[in-house]
From Swiss-Prot:
Entry GO terms, CC: cytosolic small ribosomal subunit
Native species: Campylobacter hominis (strain ATCC BAA-381 / DSM 21671 / CCUG 45161 / LMG 19568 / NCTC 13146 / CH001A)
Protein name from the UniProt record: Small ribosomal subunit protein bS6
Region (Disordered): 113-145
InterPro entries: Ribosomal_bS6, Ribosomal_bS6_sf, Ribosomal_S6_plastid/chlpt, Transl_elong_EF1B/ribsomal_bS6
Role description: Binds together with bS18 to 16S ribosomal RNA.
Name of the gene this protein is made from: rpsF
Record keywords: Ribonucleoprotein, Ribosomal protein, RNA-binding, rRNA-binding
Bias kind Acidic residues: ranges: 133-145
Amino acid sequence: MKHYEVLFIVKPTLQDDEVKTKVDFVKEVITKNGGEIAAVVEMGTRKLAYKIDKYERGVYFVIYFTAPTKLIAELVRNLRINEDIIRFLTIKYENKKEISAWEKLSHGVKLSENMKKNERKAPKEPVKKDEEENKESEEEITSEE
């Protein structure tokens, strides 16, 4: 199986649940045709370089996956039919250097997702220092002068 990346832009006028449905649709096309998804990246809403079908912005997504070659034709066909996807680009990673870059990218996405899940929230109140620590640091500053 070969390594691929598909970037697609969804219309910005869609609601969040409709956008999620479009992403799930693309993921389903990949998995139904024998592909394995490594990572999905939501890049968010961004300004387009030029207007596409009267839109100046779009919601960007990138999916890293491995798949047999025949899947790409089916994926492209489905992306062209879907009117809510205004642009797409499929990239094939061929040589060892490109494949290692693909692995780093897809692995890096997984790591950043795990880090977001494991992040601790900041305390609501600031942590107070003891008055003694403040006095000691002031004494050190005055002694250095």
